[in-house]
C-alpha cells in the first residue's frame, strides 16, 4: 500500500532548495498567469524572485478566494483537554522535560469549558491535547467525544497520531476533521528536535494523513512549523507536495493548510530560519493559487495588525481568543499554556474588525438535523 512516504523518498531537500532559489522573474510571471499551477510554478511562487511580485500575487489570491468562498470567514476555537505529554520536543511548552503543572480535564471541567466557549458564540471546536496515549488516548476520547458532539456543530482534533481503525471509530463518534502537522519534512532536523517518545517516529507521523484518508475523515489539516528547519521555503514546498498527494489519493476528503510560526514557550528555542510577514503573505497566497478550493487557516500566533490585513486576502478560517492551556476559558492559568498567543482579542472584536472590511464571520455552517459528513458511509 503506497503512502506519501513513497513520494517523500523521491524528493531531495537540497535539490528542491536549489531549484527554488534558481527561479527567475520570468518563472514567477508564468506562474502568476497559469490557470492551474504546476510543481515548478509553486516553487517559483515560494522563491526569492517572487518577493517583487507580492502585490500581483495577493490580488490574484484574493480574487480566487472571493470566487470560491465569497466574503465568508469561518471562526473556530481550540479547546485544550490536557497538557500531559510523553514526548520530549525542543520547541513545545508541553514537552515532558518541562517542569510545569499538568492538568487533564474531566467531565465537569469539559462542561464548564464548553459552556464558556458556547457563550462566546463558537460552534466549530478544535480539540487539542499533548501526546500521551496511555492517559489521554482512545479511552479518554470515547468518554468525552459524544457529549461534545451534542454541543458543537463541528468537531476537529489535534492530538497524537492514531491508527486507521481508531480514526474510523472516532468518525462514528462524530469527529469531522484532524489536524496533524509534520513540524518539518527534513528527517535529520526532525530527529534533532524530537528527543524522546513516540513522536520520534518520523514516518508514523508522515503517514498519518494517509491513515486519515483511508478512514474517511472529512477534513485533513496539514502544515509545517515554520522556523524549525533552516529553510522554510523547502518545508512549505513539502507541504504542497503532501497536499497534492493526498488530493490525488483521497479525493473524498477536504483539506486545510495552516502556517504556524514558532512562538515563545516554556523551554522553547530560537527559529533556525526566519519567515518575515511579507514572506508569510507570499506563502499563504501561493497556496491559494495552488489549491483555490482548500481551507487556509491563520491562528492567534500572529499579531492583530497582521491578521486584520492578511485575512481579507486569502484566509477563510481563523481562531479567536485562543487559550492554549487546559481550563483556559473557565479558569485561566497561563502557566499551563503550550505557547503564548499573539492576538488575544475577544472574538467579537476580531469579528468586528473583519466585518468592517466587508467580510462575513461564520460561527456555524452546519445543523445537526442535516446529518454529519463524518458519519456517512
Residue ranges of each PLM-predicted region?
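Canonical Radical SAM [4Fe-4S] cluster-binding loop centered on the CxxxCxxC motif
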Residues: 69-109
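Active-site beta-loop-alpha junctions enriched in small/polar residues
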Residues: 78-80, 130-132, 158-162, 183-185, ...
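Hydrophobic faces of well-ordered beta-strands that scaffold small-molecule active sites
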Residues: 73-77, 125, 155-159, 178-180, ...
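Short, charged low-complexity linear segments at domain edges
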Residues: 53-74
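Auxiliary Fe-S-binding modules of radical SAM enzymes
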Residues: 1-50, 248-377
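Conserved, mostly hydrophobic/aromatic
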Residues: 34, 61, 89, 180, ...
Amino acid at each position: 500500500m503506497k503512502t506519501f512516504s513513497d513520494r517523500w523518498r523521491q524528493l531531495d531537500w537540497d535539490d528542491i532548495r536549489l531549484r527554488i532559489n534558481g527561479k527567475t522573474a520570468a518563472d514567477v510571471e508564468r506562474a502568476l498567469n497559469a490557470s492551474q499551477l504546476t510543481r515548478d510554478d509553486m516553487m517559483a511562487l515560494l522563491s526569492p524572485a517572487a518577493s517583487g511580485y507580492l502585490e500581483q500575487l495577493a490580488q490574484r489570491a484574493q480574487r480566487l478566494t472571493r470566487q470560491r468562498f465569497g466574503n465568508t470567514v469561518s471562526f473556530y476555537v481550540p479547546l485544550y483537554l490536557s497538557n500531559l505529554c510523553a514526548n520530549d520536543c525542543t520547541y513545545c511548552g508541553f514537552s515532558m522535560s518541562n517542569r510545569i503543572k499538568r492538568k487533564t480535564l474531566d467531565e465537569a471541567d469539559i462542561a464548564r469549558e464548553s459552556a464558556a466557549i458556547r457563550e462566546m458564540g463558537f460552534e466549530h471546536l478544535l480539540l487539542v491535547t499533548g501526546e500521551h496515549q496511555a492517559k489521554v488516548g482512545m479511552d479518554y476520547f470515547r468518554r468525552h467525544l459524544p457529549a461534545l458532539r451534542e454541543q458543537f456543530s463541528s468537531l476537529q482534533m489535534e492530538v497524537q497520531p492514531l491508527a486507521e481503525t481508531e480514526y474510523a471509530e472516532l468518525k462514528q463518534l462524530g469527529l469531522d476533521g484532524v489536524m496533524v502537522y509534520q513540524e518539518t519534512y527534513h528527517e535529520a532536523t526532525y530527529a534533532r528536535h524530537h528527543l524522546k517518545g513516540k513522536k520520534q517516529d518520523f514516518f508514523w507521523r508522515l503517514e498519518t494523513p494517509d491513515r486519515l484518508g483511508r478512514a474517511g475523515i472529512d477534513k485533513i489539516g496539514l502544515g509545517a512549523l515554520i522556523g524549525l528547519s533552516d529553510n522554510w521555503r523547502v518545508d512549505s514546498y513539502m507541504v504542497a507536495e503532501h497536499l497534492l498527494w493526498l488530493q490525488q489519493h483521497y479525493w473524498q476528503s477536504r483539506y486545510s493548510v495552516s502556517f504556524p510560526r514558532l512562538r515563545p514557550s516554556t523551554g522553547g528555542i530560537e527559529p533556525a530560519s526566519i519567515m518575515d510577514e511579507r514572506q508569510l503573505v507570499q506563502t499563504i497566497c501561493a497556496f491559494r493559487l495552488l489549491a483555490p478550493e482548500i481551507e487556509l487557516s491563520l491562528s492567534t500566533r500572529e499579531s492583530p495588525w497582521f491578521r486584520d490585513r492578511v485575512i481579507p486576502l486569502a484566509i477563510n478560517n481563523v481562531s479567536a481568543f485562543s487559550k492554549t492551556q487546559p481550563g483556559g476559558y473557565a479558569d485561566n492559568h497561563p502557566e499551563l499554556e503550550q505557547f503564548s498567543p499573539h492576538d488575544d482579542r475577544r472574538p467579537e472584536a476580531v469579528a468586528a474588525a473583519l466585518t468592517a472590511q466587508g467580510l462575513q464571520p461564520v460561527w456555524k455552517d452546519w445543523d445537526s438535523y442535516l446529518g454529519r459528513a463524518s458519519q456517512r458511509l
